[in-house]
Swiss-Prot record:
Residues 1093-1147 are annotated as: Disordered. Its main location: membrane. The keyword Transmembrane applies. This is Multiple epidermal growth factor-like domains protein 10. One of its GO terms (molecular function) is Notch binding. The lineage of its organism: Eukaryota, Metazoa, Chordata, Craniata, Vertebrata. The modification Phosphotyrosine is found at Y1030. Residues 879-1147 are cytoplasmic. It comes from Mus musculus (Mouse). Pfam families: EGF_2 (PF07974), EGF_laminin (PF00053), EGF_PEAR1L (PF23301), hEGF (PF12661). InterPro entries: EGF-like_CS, EGF-like_dom, EGF_extracell, EGF_PEAR1L-like, EMI_domain, LE_dom, MEGF_diff_regulators. Disulfide bonds join C34-C95, C60-C69, C94-C105, C109-C124, C126-C135, C148-C160, C154-C167, C169-C178, C191-C203, C197-C210, C212-C221, C234-C246, C240-C253, C255-C264, C281-C289, C283-C296, C298-C307, C320-C332, C326-C339, C341-C350, C409-C421, C415-C428, C430-C439, C456-C464, C458-C471, C473-C482, C495-C507, C501-C514, C516-C525, C542-C550, C544-C557, C559-C568, C581-C593, C587-C600, C602-C611, C669-C681, C675-C688, C690-C699, C716-C724, C718-C731, C733-C742, C755-C767, C761-C774, C776-C785, C802-C810, C804-C817, C819-C828. Residues 1132-1147 have a biased composition (Low complexity).
Amino acid sequence: MAISSSSCLGLICSLLCHWVGTASSLNLEDPNVCSHWESYSVTVQESYPHPFDQIYYTSCTDILNWFKCTRHRISYRTAYRHGEKTMYRRKSQCCPGFYESRDMCVPHCADKCVHGRCIAPNTCQCEPGWGGTNCSSACDGDHWGPHCSSRCQCKNRALCNPITGACHCAAGYRGWRCEDRCEQGTYGNDCHQRCQCQNGATCDHITGECRCSPGYTGAFCEDLCPPGKHGPHCEQRCPCQNGGVCHHVTGECSCPSGWMGTVCGQPCPEGRFGKNCSQECQCHNGGTCDAATGQCHCSPGYTGERCQDECPVGSYGVRCAEACRCVNGGKCYHVSGTCLCEAGFSGELCEARLCPEGLYGIKCDKRCPCHLDNTHSCHPMSGECGCKPGWSGLYCNETCSPGFYGEACQQICSCQNGADCDSVTGRCACAPGFKGTDCSTPCPLGRYGINCSSRCGCKNDAVCSPVDGSCICKAGWHGVDCSIRCPSGTWGFGCNLTCQCLNGGACNTLDGTCTCAPGWRGAKCEFPCQDGTYGLNCAERCDCSHADGCHPTTGHCRCLPGWSGVHCDSVCAEGRWGPNCSLPCYCKNGASCSPDDGICECAPGFRGTTCQRICSPGFYGHRCSQTCPQCVHSSGPCHHITGLCDCLPGFTGALCNEVCPSGRFGKNCAGVCTCTNNGTCNPIDRSCQCYPGWIGSDCSQPCPPAHWGPNCIHTCNCHNGAFCSAYDGECKCTPGWTGLYCTQRCPLGFYGKDCALICQCQNGADCDHISGQCTCRTGFMGRHCEQKCPAGTYGYGCRQICDCLNNSTCDHITGTCYCSPGWKGARCDQAGVIIVGNLNSLSRTSTALPADSYQIGAIAGIVVLVLVVLFLLALFIIYRHKQKRKESSMPAVTYTPAMRVINADYTIAETLPHSNGGNANSHYFTNPSYHTLSQCATSPHVNNRDRMTIAKSKNNQLFVNLKNVNPGKRGTLVDCTGTLPADWKQGGYLNELGAFGLDRSYMGKSLKDLGKNSEYNSSTCSLSSSENPYATIKDPPALLPKSSECGYVEMKSPARRDSPYAEINNSTPANRNVYEVEPTVSVVQGVFSNSGHVTQDPYDLPKNSHIPCHYDLLPVRDSSSSPKREDGGGSNSTSSNSTSSSSSSSE
């Protein structure tokens, strides 16, 4: 039983908590901690196998239930239940005589140790110079140490400490009693000084003088003997050769790598290397070893540190430096580079295709179904399409799915940011705004468009879109390139906000603040200047004497009745002065005379004696004392009277700091713009800045076809009829296409506009990516290819007429005839008793099973009964006698339908002629447990009513016994045993043979050719790589049909592996896929007469297989209800039937 993960987690948590709790109280590593174990219970969840009744179906002879029988078996599923588990935990406490102090257990003394410490229960350890049970008594002068129990015993003139008992030794001595010399390496008083002698030299224990070991010299023996010298005092000469180094002490030679001997005079023998040749070379496969380094120099075809590896695929020769040149799937021999071609190819480099271009098959009579423009090869045997890079599908008619490219669309695109990936090269076509090999780098500032090739034209610090170059203007600017200020009355981002300024106030295009015209004030310029003030910002004060204030803009005094003059200070009429206002004034430009002296008082904007001159440039107003404001876009200084600015064309406002309102242009904004289609009008010269996608003086003309963007300067990159947006160049794909530039077909299973429609095609049909129209596979028809060919037709488009006779059925794909009971042959036109399956004597051979004839013995009834009975009785006695001596047996085999095949190859079957005119039988079996191939022994007395009994054992293996073989029917049988080559698996045969276990170097050879090879003489070996539990049985050649024509079709979809019937054990369901189980072509008579024909759906899910030929059939299991033999072989028949019955019951 298993404990669930949640229970385990709870158990671990409880143990952890207990450990933490214990650890927090006592240190378990304390030697004074004692512990004991206590038990406790926890609830856990545990799993157990729960039995249940499982129903399944097997093939049987029950014709009423269509040959299906229900079976029951007991199976188990995992269930869970709660249970209690006893756990143990350790509990810790202080040992007796100890008590707990913090996390330690300390000893307890009843009497406190005064000058000592408690080291054990009721035991004190006194400090030196003290004694007594509680260390409270001091030692007398004759004793020392703990408890005053020791006497001084110092030697070598050492002094004894009466309290500590320590001896103060003389220089060069040590020890408790100073009886020992200083340890090696120390000397002097208390041996505290360390000797400085090196390299094993000895030191005088009193003075520290060094006495050097052999091989060293110097005051501290720190130097080795000079090169070429060794021994005591470095007086001896070294004899080493070949760069050998002499040991400075012994003079022994240390040889360099590759040399050996007393004086390093001998090179390493072969197979050895390294220092003193002590290491053994580890080079394999004929590699040689460098005597110095041990590095392997590999023989041609091998590599690796020890030459243990063959050259990687695609290389050969010395150091694997040569590149293989084999084409068309040919395998390159790693030593010489010789090409081992796949079936269907030949030539030194496998460059020659056996079939003409466009054809394939055994007879090169089938036309390749590949789309030629997208295909680089059509396999000459299987017809499999080898797609060019960028294409996939059965017929190379599908582009790579988005995100994949290259050979077989197996490589993953690295493109980022919505880039298109070239399905052939994988090169990235970046979306506008990105660049780089993988389109991961955004455009730098100032660049935009495809590959960032265009330069931004935005002005006034506007942000340029890296995609289409459109400008995102800062506040206060607008236009295609952000070169135009916001029109009068607008401000902010996009000039979308309306100014709130009144009375001619100018609006700041950035923040909307108002700059008031002269004479006005307030946040919105809604208030006139206060009484007594006038001018810009109401900063000037009125200079009037008898007036009702002054004009808020000009400061002109509004005189009270009876008063006149510039300052309203004269009682004379306008133009008079002096006594009784009798003198005329000569002042000009509205000036007044002083009533006293006639001096001219000039009106605002004028100056001079008679006020005939205007203010100097830059000044205006009363007495020309006011300074002109900063006119932004003006043709000159301000007006000498009002102070207003004279604006340039396109500008307006008191300070000429406002652009003409939208739709107006020119001097005083008097002109009307004519721009259309959202074009921006230049307020100065009326020119139009067109919106992307439009051109012309008034932006009324759209971009020409295949152009887009501002002024239509960019060229569209859309393909396959896609519509290109004139604004941003975006491609609007036509139905059936997708991708950034509409270069990719709809993914598999989709079609139509935006690839949004789901294909409805069935049975592996191709779906047109534009219209969704289905192109049916061979054997199907209908709008969605949902219908099989009508009865009597088959093939592509169901245009071919079946040629099957005698009520036989026709395969709707291949036209293969499925014969009615009692018939055989390619067209079911032969009355048959023997059914043979043969596809290829070398590639794949199906089992041929004998059957009883309904008519044998009919002619014998005409003969005189007495003579016939006597004759048959004699034959029967002879047969029984021979049969007892024969006792031939066959090894156990496991059948597979040999249909789960990839790239299977065909070779025309041949037979070996025998000396007596018969055919030599190459009868063989394949079995995972048997690698020995057995052939049947010759039997001179064989009844032509031969039978093959098939019984199923308890371990589900099939055992086959060939009995009563007729020499005339089956040819002379040779008793021999062939064994597989020793390197069958190790030499790579398993990978080279293909799905049928055939070395392709033997493809196309006859059995006669193979028979000449001594290694394979008298044996035919088969090694199946199929995953099915049935292997192939090759029957005697006499059972082969005269014609070897076989139905053949290429199906490449993968086989289903998840079906509960993917492997055959005890039954063959009615819906068995014909590509997983070979169809029963004809009903076997005699012992198999109740088997019947099983209706199957052979095209449930096709895969890359070869359709069986007309004579392929399943191994049929014997039934307990079958009739007994007609030849009187009762014992054999009974034995066979009983064996079959036991097999059935075992299920």
